[in-house]
Amino acid sequence: MTSIYTSTEPTNSAFTTEDYKPQLVEGVNSVLVIGSGGLSIGQAGEFDYSGSQAIKALKEDNKFTILVNPNIATNQTSHSLADKIYYLPVTPEYITYIIELERPDAILLTFGGQTGLNCGVALDESGVLAKYNVKVLGTPIKTLITSEDRDLFASALKDINIPIAESFACETVDEALEAAERVKYPVIVRSAYALGGLGSGFANNASEMKELAAQSLSLAPQILVEKSLKGWKEVEYEVVRDRVGNCITVCNMENFDPLGVHTGDSMVFAPSQTLSDEEFHMLRSAAIKIIRHLGVIGECNVQYALQPDGLDYRVIEVNARLSRSSALASKATGYPLAYTAAKIGLGYTLPELPNPITKTTVANFEPSLDYIVAKIPKWDLSKFQYVDRSIGSSMKSVGEVMAIGRNYEEAFQKALRQVDPSLLGFQGSTEFGDQLDEALRTPTDRRVLAIGQALIHENYTVERVNELSKIDKWFLYKCMNIVNIYKELESVKSLSDLSKDLLQRAKKLGFSDKQIAVTINKHASTNINELEIRSLRKTLGIIPFVKRIDTLAAEFPAQTNYLYTTYNATKNDVEFNENGMLVLGSGVYRIGSSVEFDWCAVNTAKTLRDQGKKTIMINYNPETVSTDFDEVDRLYFEELSYERVMDIYELEQSEGCIISVGGQLPQNIALKLYDNGCNIMGTNPNDIDRAENRHKFSSILDSIDVDQPEWSELTSVEEAKLFASKVNYPVLIRPSYVLSGAAMSVVNNEEELKAKLTLASDVSPDHPVVMSKFIEGAQEIDVDAVAYNGNVLVHAISEHVENAGVHSGDASLVLPPQHLSDDVKIALKDIADKVAKAWKITGPFNMQIIKDGEHTLKVIECNIRASRSFPFVSKVLGVNFIEIAVKAFLGGDIVPKPVDLMLNKKYDYVATKVPQFSFTRLAGADPFLGVEMASTGEVASFGRDLIESYWTAIQSTMNFHVPLPPSGILFGGDTSREYLGQVASIVATIGYRIYTTNETTKTYLQEHIKEKNAKVSLIKFPKNDKRKLRELFQEYDIKAVFNLASKRAESTDDVDYIMRRNAIDFAIPLFNEPQTALLFAKCLKAKIAEKIKILESHDVIVPPEVRSWDEFIGFKAY
């Protein structure tokens, strides 16, 4: 493929003169940017950050930007950023329609993760890019294909004598078995064109290999079988190259875990800590050699396996696109990788680009770090039934944190607290018992606690832990430094016995005030709290210093606002004279708290700046836009703990602190901050507590005459039994102060009640547990609103497609609501008014309400903070709810007048938000939906009606393939209700073949299907044989599964569980909730004929749902 870049001569000239004109790609006025879609395991918020930076870079050059991304929660889909936004599936099919309509001059493929890259390759192979003369900016398609196709990649690296693990590309199971014999077991299997190691794994023998190869080939057309190098060190380099060959390495990183754990699931440190100078330069030179040979133009990530005790190495893989690692590298160094890569894509060379952080140097430099960065992944595996907790070559984490310190211990302990606020820092856990050696040997999401247990409590030596875990001794000796401080603290008998020297040394190694207090209390008969430790250290003058990340290790003057705190310093790098407004970000992405709260935080900062306020953001998530260098006046990459927030609040002498836009984490420390003198903006934290505490909340609802399901506060199992028998099962048990329904459960009988009560009490022992009547079959409604001094300014009413009982974060939301009368809307607004008044709300709040029957409305929850649906309602209605909330915080003349967007405005469009699940990644997990949240992200689409918007939205979820007739559909689940029959009766009329696994279901379906030509076939279901199941799905061409079981499986032997799980494993659409199953069946009936006609046509026919956001809305909002 010929280059679209005009010059090929290398140059090192810096931009100096006014009249110098860079040689840019010619004829590019409009650029199509491909987003990554809904957040999933392996592809998360890092692409919101990189895509947002890319759009900013393009707009600086006056390019018209067209974005396709159905992830409505992201910052990049804010309407102040791209010129045009399409909330449509990121698939070759839909991108072709957009190209047909928009005729862009160029396309950016490397900012949308694996999804975007795969789309680009498919569009090139099908000839679409050539047909419409769309230029690919940045790395050429040929290079992308070479880096993704394992055979081509191996051959390219052989050309330049770069060693890679011996490997064979295979397209069948037999080929894979033969390859494994040739490279000798153990082997690793990798999928080509797959994300986050999806479809990869280790095999120790032929039977394991057969199973793994079959599964991997169902996810990708080609797999690579290679010798396993488990136990070697894993090291990564981020490299940038421009069109004329200038190359720099921006960051190198070292994994704490040896090879065998996917880098996304490994703790990572930057810069590398255990490499010799020779090893460092050997790998750096190889990275530059690789990127030049492959012809990368932009940013690239190179992953190595390095022999622990020698100079032997292998290249594991090259990502010729922006990745999770590049987001981390960008935040770790302060070097704006995505921005620079986008500029390089336009044709700029590195010496022509100013460094936007320092403002005084050019981008053609390698950052130098005078600090250490620690990244730790966040797993949420405990939310899933039957999930396999081991971690390996396929990624399972849902988010990550980044901590900065002046030494390993400081960064490591900070990061551990960030990833789980219930941890004190580096600590042990008694959960392993006599399985401790096994816990050290096998990587799981809990292994770091096993290391803590071994070193702190079980007196294991570094040698023994190293032998079992293969983790480098350097890291373990550093952990021992923390252990030694623990030992010293254990001998302290009282607060007055704690010396300044010990306190200072503990703080320098990353100990928190609370950690110090708890450690002393455990071994002395004291009851010291963290506030007393804080008071003592302040009296002794032990206060953290604020340091600046300047990318240049303080060698050049820098103007960065990118800050962290440390006890390993002697002076501050900044002056504290701005009294900025503090905004607390969302912290780590996890199930229940994701990119939507980052959108809220970013929009809060933007509105504050628009109002002339100085802004200070605290957040520690490297995947976010809120931690980008140009979003706020000052950014602290720091913990969201009481201790750290108060440190920064006091140092900065902040005007106030906003705690209600970052989800549950900031909310949890609000009361403590307020009680200790922090000016909390908006609703009084005492009032927030009255909503978070279930008992207080329910009592106030009773007092203001707002209906709710019957409830009772639990003090004993006996009382609970009495209440349940009074209101009749099912009942809902819920603890206070939780996010995403953690430990919430629906209980159907007395036996379940006893088991669940223990669990609920364990979740938040400091707060009461409340039990309420669970109303089956009711409709659920979300109300998002903003109030000022108890008066509602603006509100949105979204209805759930699913019945109550599915967590609101896993529900499909429809806005404007399609099935609510004006009377119901008026009643909902009345409830919102009463609640806002009773809690004296100023700022955002969200309520979940159930509609039981025609007119009965009952409130089930109220959160006095922004909810995860705030970006959705803001973008669908064209009114920025966060902007209004911030104006309410500030008060005065800028507070807008109240407006009713639900009754006084008519809409000729509908938007539907649907959840994005990541069950494919979570081996064994039951994809059954309930009151505890399971989705990792969301997507939304617009349409003229509910059918059109849901049809587009469901196709926007990752790897969703619409089943085309006459393929087969497998039915299973509960036959005591009508739903399954209603779904079957619809799909039978469209020409699908209908299958089931037992006589009862067959008879039931036959009774419901009225179509004369349709027949129900019974198939033998080999439930315990994965290979035969796969063959069965292929033989009967099963392309969708409707399994409407009414409750979770009680064992992994349950046929419904096996049906659900295998639909996920074989990448087949699964519908297991009655209302969404019915809605999808109606979509198929309405849309499938049109889809088939479009797919069979030789011309490009654009379906009616392909319209941009502003075409639906009718105006360009905020």
From Swiss-Prot:
Residues binding Mn(2+) 1, per UniProt: Q303, E317
Keyword field: Amino-acid biosynthesis, Arginine biosynthesis, ATP-binding, Cytoplasm, Ligase, Manganese, Metal-binding, Nucleotide-binding, Repeat
pH dependence of this protein's activity: Optimum pH is 8.0.
Subunit composition and interactions: Heterodimer composed of 2 chains; the small (or glutamine) chain promotes the hydrolysis of glutamine to ammonia, which is used by the large (or ammonia) chain to synthesize carbamoyl phosphate.
Region annotation (Allosteric domain) ranges: 959-1102
Additional remarks: In S.cerevisiae, this enzyme is synthesized by two pathway-specific (arginine and pyrimidine) genes under separate control. One is linked to the arginine pathway and is designated CPSase A (CPA1-CPA2); it is repressed by arginine. A second one, CPSase P, is part of a multifunctional protein (URA3) encoding 3 enzymatic activities of the pyrimidine pathway (GATase, CPSase, and ATCase); it is feedback inhibited and repressed by pyrimidines.
Domain of life of the native organism: Eukaryota
GO biological process: L-arginine biosynthetic process; pyrimidine nucleotide biosynthetic process
Chain positions recorded as Mg(2+) 3 binding sites: Q848, E861
Phenotypic consequence of D810 to A/E/N: Abolishes ammonia-dependent ATPase activity
Catalytic activity: hydrogencarbonate + L-glutamine + 2 ATP + H2O = carbamoyl phosphate + L-glutamate + 2 ADP + phosphate + 2 H(+)
ATP-grasp domain location: 154-346, 698-890
Residues that bind ATP 1: R150, R190, G196, G197, K227, L229, E234, G260, V261, H262, Q303, E317
The EC number(s) this enzyme carries: 6.3.4.16, 6.3.5.5
Top-rank EC class of the record's enzyme: ligase
Binding site for Mn(2+) 3: Q848, E861
Domain MGS-like as annotated: residue spans: 960-1118
Pathway recorded for this protein: Amino-acid biosynthesis; L-arginine biosynthesis; carbamoyl phosphate from bicarbonate: step 1/1
Binding-site list for Mn(2+) 2: E317, N319
Main location (coarse class): cytoplasm
Binding annotation for Mg(2+) 4: E861, N863
CDD domains: MGS_CPS_I_III
Residues that, per the record, bind Mg(2+) 2: E317, N319
Protein name (Swiss-Prot/TrEMBL): Carbamoyl phosphate synthase arginine-specific large chain
Positions contributing to Mg(2+) 1 binding: Q303, E317
Binding annotation for ATP 2: R734, K773, I775, E780, G805, V806, H807, S808, Q848, E861
